[in-house]
Structure formats: structure tokens, C-alpha cells
Amino acid sequence: MRIFIGIDLDPEVRARIERFLEGVESFAPDARWVRPESLHITLKFIGEQSPDRVEAISERLRRVESGAFEIRSGGYGFFPTAKAPRVFWIGIHAGPQFAELAASIDMAVAELGIPREDRPFSPHLTLARAGGRSGSPKWRKGDAPNATFAVLEKRLAAMGELDFGTMTAHEFILYQSQLSPGGSKYTKLQRFPMRPPANTAE
């Protein structure tokens, strides 16, 4: 099965993003837009694994320790570059705990021979993809310009700063991803709770 590790959005943040999408999807009608219910923050993509390997990965993930932390979603950008946009995303902003969690997960599954990440952790929410080649930053060199997001870029520039609110990340999740013509379907296989934030009340 095809798996990855991520963080789900809370309902309020998801609803704000859904309302935003309803207002901007028409500005890039040729793009493949992500369904709001499928939005998530990816911590580590793993790919195809056997059921036995999935269980071994789950066992490693149970050993990962992290406290809950705040995440703010806002701002936007395009991969691989604004001149050759193939992915439209909104930013995810958090303290060092977020990157530390991603690094801990990366190290935990590396014990099973899963390749380590070769680029810095850059959390984001993918909202839409253009057709053709991957929008991965690895395509940065030699990627051809395209006009899929041209109108959207102009509209976004006129909107000012995007802010979809703040949420608390209190767990990370092992997902299964099933590909289909209508878009990927994500199933939550297992949840891994994080320590609650320290109580600062007197």
C-alpha cells in the first residue's frame, strides 16, 4: 500500500480554506484542484510498502515523541518557481518543534531502510497542480513556463495577505493514499498522539 505521514487540519481552518477555494478555482480552470476534505500537511512521504512493512513503520512511529504545537496557515507560493508554476500552495508556519518532529519521523523510519529526506523540511498545503510534469522543486532547472495559474497569480496579488487561522497540532497520522481518476483518496491507518501543551494557567 502507498503510505505517508501527515497532520490533519482542524475543521475551522479547513472551512476557511474551502471558502477561499470556492472563490478562486475559476481563476485557474485547467488546474487540478485538491478537494478540501483531502487537505493535509505532509511530514514524510514513504510510498509503496507491504502490510508487514507498514506495521514495522507504525512500531517505529510509536517511539517518536513530540509535544503539541501551534500551526498557522497563510501566505502562498508556487513550485518550482513563480515563472514556471506547476503547484499552487499556501504556507504553514510553526516553531522549531514542527521541523524537529519531521526530523524525528525521518530518522525513525530510516531505521527500516527508507531513504532520508535530501532537502530541508518546507511545510505547505498543496491546493492545485498544473498538468504535465511534477511540481517538485527538483524540476526547478529547465522547467518550461506555463500559463495555468497566470490569472490566479494576478488575482492573488490584489487580495493582499492570506491568513487562514491557527490550530494546535496534537497528533500525527499514518495515511494510506489510493490513486484514482477522480483524485487521491486518503485513509487514516493510525494516529500517534503528542503530549498536550504545558498548562500555563496559574
Please describe what each predicted stretch is.
Residues M1-E202:
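Histidine-dependent nucleotide/RNA phosphoesterase domain, centered on the 2H-phosphoesterase fold
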